[in-house]
Design a protein with these regions (language model features):
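Conserved small/polar residues in nucleotide/adenosyl-binding loops
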Residues: 192-198
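Membrane-helix boundary/juxtamembrane motif in polytopic membrane proteins
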Residues: 128-132, 152-172
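Non-cytosolic membrane-interface motifs at loop->transmembrane helix junctions
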Residues: 52-62, 122-131, 190-191
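Alpha-helical transmembrane segments in multipass membrane proteins, preferentially the mid-helix core
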Residues: 6-10, 74-78, 139-159
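Membrane-interface helix-boundary motifs at transmembrane edges
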Residues: 12-25, 80-93, 154-164
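Hydrophobic alpha-helical transmembrane segments of multi-pass membrane proteins
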Residues: 1-16, 20-53, 57-77, 97-114, ...
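Extracellular-loop-to-transmembrane junctions of the mid-late helices
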Residues: 1, 107-148
């Protein structure tokens, strides 16, 4: 998956999209690949009670929490840019839209001391914190909003080409949403567990 995402990111630089769209799609590919990498580290380190295992668990979770939210934000920006959204017309609005993701990043990295979003117990096992749900709520709101926006746009336009683009934007993230929901329900399952065969 990481190789495919990085390959798509590199190829997007040669596409017919605008420079902004190219940059956003490239960033999405690299961020998603990095997220999967750190999620794999969590899979390997969770339950390892050695100092190295616990440290790897802390770092991988803080980084993967942050990268997932950032990837959803980038997808939101990319999708809304493709749709010509008014939300991105001023720097002030862009900053406001970025603040929830910044909150997730701060909570993720301060959880080492506060345990608000997650913590690693003495056995080296990942546990959710009291404010864990902030991360999926923030991340999913970006994706759900832009997907619904694209779906509505697809119904409004008459151009078949634009309809196809908007429908792709509307349904592109559905598999990720389903997988993410599964991960929320079953807290011990990482994204890697959902994509790789296990014993």
């Amino acid at each position: 998956c990481m190789i495919i995402l990085i390959g798509l990111a590199v190829r997007s630089r040669r596409s017919l999209f605008s420079s902004t769209q190219q940059l956003l799609f490239s960033m999405l590919g690299y961020t998603s690949a990095a997220y999967i990498f750190f999620d794999m580290i969590w899979t390997l380190s969770d339950g390892v009670s050695t100092p190295v295992g616990i440290t790897a668990n802390w770092i991988s979770n803080a980084v993967s929490f942050s990268l997932f939210a950032i990837a959803c934000l980038i997808w939101f920006f990319y999708s809304e840019t493709m749709q010509g959204s008014r939300l991105l017309t001023t720097p002030y609005r862009v900053v406001l839209l970025t603040l929830p993701t910044a909150l997730v990043v701060v909570l993720a990295f301060t959880s080492y001391w506060t345990h608000t979003m997650f913590y690693i117990d003495t056995q080296g096992v990942y546990r959710r914190g009291a404010l864990y749900m902030i991360q999926p709520i923030v991340s999913y709101c970006y994706v759900i909003y832009t997907s619904l926006h694209a779906f509505i746009q697809a119904r409004k336009v008459e151009s078949l080409q634009k309809k196809a683009i908007y429908r792709t934007l509307a349904f592109f993230a559905v598999p990720a949403l389903v997988g993410g929901t599964f991960q929320i329900v079953y807290s011990a399952v990482s994204y890697t567990h959902l994509t790789l065969p296990t014993k």
